[in-house]
Amino acid sequence: MTYRLEFLPSARKEWEKLGHTLREQFKKKLAERLEMPRIPADALHGMPDCYKIKLKSSGYRLVYEVIDERVVISVVAVGKRERSSVYERAKKR
């Protein structure tokens, strides 16, 4: 089953601020996650149904939520990992 991709409005703004290369790297990984979104190693503690995609070379993270009822992956936050700021923003949304 393939999931659809959605963005929270605030995550969409963060996405649009990313450079072309970073967006392309995330797109490739998101395409894989649309087929199989639940990767246990990437589950976020304290945030049910939320997972991360990390670009190790650049230090960027993308946090998404899996919504099975609507067959949707919703991007919650995108940003640098610096002091876990991307994860803190994701928790607040």
Model-inferred region functions:
Residues 2-6, 12-13, 17, 24, ...:
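Enriched for short, Lys/Arg-rich terminal
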Residues 21-35:
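Compact soluble domain cores
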Residues 31-56:
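A short, surface-exposed loop/turn module that caps and links secondary-structure elements
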